[in-house]
């Protein structure tokens, strides 16, 4: 997961994918995510997620949230399978 403004890795907070870019795969999926991020100033990061249940890698526009409860709620609102704890590099299934 990288900061959309400076492309530097984000090392803390919880990454929550945005529903509008879920199911983005391959180079065209990555291009779709980058375009979406450039058009939505509220999105502060983008990255990828490996789903071990189906062995697929997803690209996502992402919001970084500092509070776990808020991140979980935002994840549920966006119909996400999981969010990611960037400080501890752990997936949190919802």
Annotate each predicted stretch with a short phrase.
Residues 1-94:
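Conserved, structured core segments of small domains
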């Amino acid at each position: 997961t990288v900061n959309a403004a400076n492309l530097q890795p984000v090392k803390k907070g919880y990454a929550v994918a945005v529903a509008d870019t879920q199911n983005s795969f391959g180079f065209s999926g990555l291009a779709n995510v980058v375009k979406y991020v450039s058009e939505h100033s509220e999105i502060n990061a983008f990255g990828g997620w490996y789903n071990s249940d189906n062995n697929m890698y997803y690209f996502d526009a992402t919001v970084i949230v500092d509070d776990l409860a808020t991140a979980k709620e935002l994840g549920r609102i966006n119909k996400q399978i999981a969010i990611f704890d960037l400080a501890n590099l752990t997936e949190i299934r919802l």
